[in-house]
């Protein structure tokens, strides 16, 4: 990959984890995060944009930066998502909610990898990576459009329950 040899490949495979650890350490320094909704959406946007950057990168340095940002964006969004889920879920269903989250957390990425592999086989690896980043940002825009109040979530307010079909 990028003709960087074994050592370069090792650094590339570590860059995302390094970004996650650094972001996790930074976030842990704030006992009470403000503007959680905005921070969540910014971190998901960074994740998507960095994924696009990775797909377009032709140099080792740019790929390292992109992967570092992918890891950082993912770590921050995961921390905030888990915090919101814990604070907003009623006590009597928190265990079930956590179980559902774990199913998606453990199974979702593997399904995404199958999709990415199929797209890469049909259109090439760079297209697969770039289209994944674009899909992330498009999904983010759709969520903001459908639930704009989430952007303003600050940890104090109760989020409205989703509408049910009658």
What are these regions (language model features)?
Residues 1-166:
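C-terminal transmembrane bundle of multi-pass solute transporters/carriers
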């Amino acid at each position: 990959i990028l003709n960087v040899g074994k050592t370069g490949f090792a650094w590339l495979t570590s860059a995302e984890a390094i970004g996650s650890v650094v972001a996790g350490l930074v976030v842990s320094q704030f006992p009470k995060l403000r503007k959680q909704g905005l921070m969540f959406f910014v971190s998901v946007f960074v994740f998507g944009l960095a994924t696009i950057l990775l797909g377009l990168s032709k140099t080792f340095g740019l790929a390292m930066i992109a992967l570092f940002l992918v890891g950082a964006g993912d770590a921050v969004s995961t921390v905030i998502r888990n915090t919101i889920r814990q604070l907003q879920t009623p006590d009597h269903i928190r265990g079930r909610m956590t179980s559902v989250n774990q199913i998606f957390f453990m199974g979702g990425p593997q399904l995404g990898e199958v999709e990415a592999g199929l797209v890469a086989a049909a259109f090439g690896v760079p297209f697969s990576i770039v289209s994944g980043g674009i899909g992330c940002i498009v999904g983010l825009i759709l969520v903001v459009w459908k639930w704009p109040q989430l952007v303003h979530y600050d940890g104090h307010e109760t989020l409205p329950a989703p509408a049910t079909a009658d």
